[in-house]
């Protein structure tokens, strides 16, 4: 009950309201292709790689419609008739037999694309030239890299350096077995020049203390480690409900397993809980990690992750950020949990052996059996890793995908709700020792499909989404829609032209030119806007509806007095003010303020009598006014008629009485 109260207080400000629809700048589709899925981008080359049912594409990231020879390539995925027939005889769903990509990654210094596809329910590995998409190696079947069933969550990362003998390898968090019943973190046998150097290595899938029905969302190669982000069943509560926690796990690249104990099993595996919660006496937890992106900035590595609550009537989402240094510190020094028949307990520091679980070794075969027995049963750190104050806690939505644009003084987060095809753009920056955020805008994406499959970002230019209908390309900013200098300067991609009073995309040229205004500080309005902000005059007629563009968390005033939502005045979630059925008392000067700074200023003039109409809108407004007057006249006439009838009846009754 207390958690519900916290939930109500925190999320009350985010009541739902329809966001504005935005059209894609460009779209790409192929009538011979089924579902469009994976995205991979090379910003320097301006290349967008797309995986789909039936093919792999290389598109020009600045215009995905351009199919010119120098910027476009297509690799068809083919299944022979005999392979298709054999697959259909065993598959539960014939769509599983269609050739379809599951995983795309760069390798060989971006010169090659590593592809794992499901072809006739077989995982097929290809290495393609990143320019022509021609095969650089013979395709091969390899288990444990990607899943056949697209409904299974998995993750994989190609690691080119730091492995034993510096052999390139893939690390995966995956489900194997006929029904996907085996959950494991896996590295296939290490080979070089066709020779096997080391056997495969994995977690123990038969022991759920290692992984308990995990749902993997991301994996990253960082230094001497590979990190895996996932959610898993932590325990069952007293009501028999399965409690889910989000985790980060870490393994060492040099790990080759133990000599006797933990043979071909990770000796360095260790994990901890990710804590994304609203602080309170009874914290409100977002326990289901949905997506994660890595950001390297100012010598530190950050992981931005989206989280949601369980799928209940009160589903909600938030974004949390985790620092690599904090993750490593906890995994390196935190107390470890031991699970017994009576529950889980933290072991004391002096019980932890000299070779601590999670420590990297140049030769894991040299670790003692005693230390490995301890590592085998002490996998979880007792404390959790804090994600700080949740960014944009929001109810009734699930943030399924995230991309992050790194700008000089801030990071811009794009969070997506796949099912509702909606995106939130958020500014996130550090001020002193405190991280702050500001919602810039929320938009609905107009795409011809029911959900988003994947997202990618071309920094400071476009974001891309895949769906069943194709690939859609959207600009990171809609500057021309900003009505004022203040709102324009809050968007880090925009700049205000003081001469033309228009908002345009910021460029290197206009950013420092005379007459152009943009904020140099994250989340702050440019002080120059106060000198150029103009009063907008809007003429309306009795009965009209009116919409004034405002800003998120803005406060509306009319002639210096606060405007509250009511029967005819509605302040939307995006900060817009909607006036319904305009009356004479609605005339005045309206201001939208935030932190006592005027963002929008407009004077509304309400005309009592219609002037001669000069447009269809004015004609309709006058028509409404005359209709109202006609209705009032009819009502008065009916009252007079009823009264007259009563008078006549009264006189007749009086005459008969005499």
From Swiss-Prot:
Its main location: secreted. Disruption phenotype: Worms have defects both in early embryonic morphogenesis and in postembryonic male tail morphogenesis. Gene3D superfamilies: Immunoglobulins, YVTN repeat-like/Quinoprotein amine dehydrogenase. Glycans are attached at residues 65, 153, 275, 653. Residues 20-476 form the Sema domain. Disulfide bonds join 87-97, 252-360, 276-320, 479-494, 488-503. GO terms for biological process: axon guidance; axonal fasciculation; embryonic body morphogenesis; morphogenesis of embryonic epithelium; negative chemotaxis; nematode male tail mating organ morphogenesis; nematode male tail tip morphogenesis; positive regulation of cell migration. InterPro entries: Ig-like_dom_sf (IPR036179), Ig-like_fold (IPR013783), Semap_dom (IPR001627), Semap_dom_sf (IPR036352), Semaphorin (IPR027231), WD40/YVTN_repeat-like_dom_sf (IPR015943). CDD domains: Sema_2A. SMART domains: Sema. It comes from the Eukaryota. One of its GO terms (cellular component) is extracellular region. It is found in: Secreted. Residues 478-527 form the PSI domain. Keywords: Developmental protein, Disulfide bond, Glycoprotein, Immunoglobulin domain, Secreted, Signal. Belongs to the semaphorin family. Interacts with plx-2. This is Semaphorin-2A. It comes from Caenorhabditis elegans. The gene is mab-20.
């Amino acid at each position: 009950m207390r958690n519900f109260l916290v939930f109500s207080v925190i999320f009350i400000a985010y009541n739902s309201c329809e966001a504005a629809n935005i059209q894609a700048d460009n779209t790409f589709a192929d009538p011979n292709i089924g579902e469009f899925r994976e995205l991979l981008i090379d910003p320097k080359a301006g290349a967008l790689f797309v995986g789909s049912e039936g093919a792999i594409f290389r598109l020009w990231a600045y215009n995905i419609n351009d199919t010119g020879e120098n910027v476009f390539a297509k690799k068809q995925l083919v299944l022979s008739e005999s392979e298709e027939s054999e697959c259909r005889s065993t598959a539960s769903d014939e769509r599983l037999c269609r050739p379809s990509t599951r995983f795309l990654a760069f390798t060989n210094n971006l010169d090659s694309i590593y592809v794992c596809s499901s072809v006739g329910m077989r995982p097929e590995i290809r290495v393609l030239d990143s320019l022509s998409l021609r095969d650089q190696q013979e395709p091969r079947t390899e288990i444990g890299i990607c899943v056949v069933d697209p409904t299974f969550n998995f993750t994989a990362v190609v690691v080119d350096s730091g492995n034993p003998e510096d052999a390139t390898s893939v690390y995966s968090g995956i489900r194997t077995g006929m029904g996907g019943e085996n959950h494991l973190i896996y590295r296939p046998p290490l080979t070089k020049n066709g020779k096997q150097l080391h056997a495969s290595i994995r977690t123990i899938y038969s022991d759920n203390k290692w992984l308990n029905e995990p749902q993997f969302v991301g994996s990253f190669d960082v230094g001497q480690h590979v990190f895996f982000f996932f959610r898993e069943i932590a325990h069952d509560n007293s009501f028999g409900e399965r409690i889910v926690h989000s985790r980060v796990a870490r393994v060492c690249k040099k790990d080759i397993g133990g000599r006797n104990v933990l043979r071909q099993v990770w000796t360095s595996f260790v994990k901890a809980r990710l804590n994304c919660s609203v602080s309170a006496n009874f914290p409100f937890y977002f326990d289901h990690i949905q997506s994660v992106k890595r950001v390297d900035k100012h010598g530190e590595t950050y992981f931005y992750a989206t989280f949601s609550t369980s799928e209940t009537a009160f589903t909600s989402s938030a974004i949390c950020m985790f620092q690599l240094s904090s993750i490593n510190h906890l995994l390196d020094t935190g107390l470890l949990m031991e699970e017994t028949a009576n529950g889980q307990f933290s072991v004391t520091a002096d019980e932890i052996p000299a070779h601590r679980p999670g420590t990297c070794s140049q030769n894991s075969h040299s670790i003692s059996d005693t230390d490995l027995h301890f590592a085998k049963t002490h996998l979880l750190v007792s404390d959790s890793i804090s994600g700080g104050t949740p960014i944009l806690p929001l109810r009734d939505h699930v943030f399924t995908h995230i991309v992050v644009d790194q700008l000089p003084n801030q990071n811009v987060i794009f969070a997506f709700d796949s099912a509702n095809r909606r995106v939130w753009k958020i500014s996130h920056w550090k001020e002193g020792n405190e991280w702050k955020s500001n919602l810039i805008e929320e938009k609905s994406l107009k795409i011809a499909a029911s959900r988003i499959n994947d997202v990618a970002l071309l920094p400071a230019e476009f974001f891309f989404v895949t769906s069943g209908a194709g690939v859609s390309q959207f600009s990171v900013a809609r500057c021309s829609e900003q009505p004022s200098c203040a709102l324009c300067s809050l968007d880090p991609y925009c700049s205000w032209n003081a001469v033309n009073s228009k908002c345009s995309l910021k460029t290197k040229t206009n950013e420092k030119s005379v007459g152009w205004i943009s904020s140099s500080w994250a989340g702050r309005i440019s002080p120059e806007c106060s000198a150029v902000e103009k009063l907008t005059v809007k003429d309306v007629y009795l009965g009209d509806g009116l919409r004034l563009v405002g800003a998120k968390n803005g406060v509306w005033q009319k002639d210096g007095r606060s405007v509250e939502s009511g029967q005819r005045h509605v302040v939307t979630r995006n900060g817009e003010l909607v006036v319904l059925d305009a009356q004479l008392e609605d005339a005045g000067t309206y201001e939208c303020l935030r932190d006592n700074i005027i963002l929008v200023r407009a004077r509304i003039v309400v005309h009592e009598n219609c002037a001669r109409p000069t447009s269809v809108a004015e004609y309709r407004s006058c028509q409404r006014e005359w209709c109202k007057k006609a209705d009032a006249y009819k009502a008065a006439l009916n009252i007079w008629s009823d009264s007259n009838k009563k008078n006549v009846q009264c006189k007749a009754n009086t005459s008969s009485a005499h």
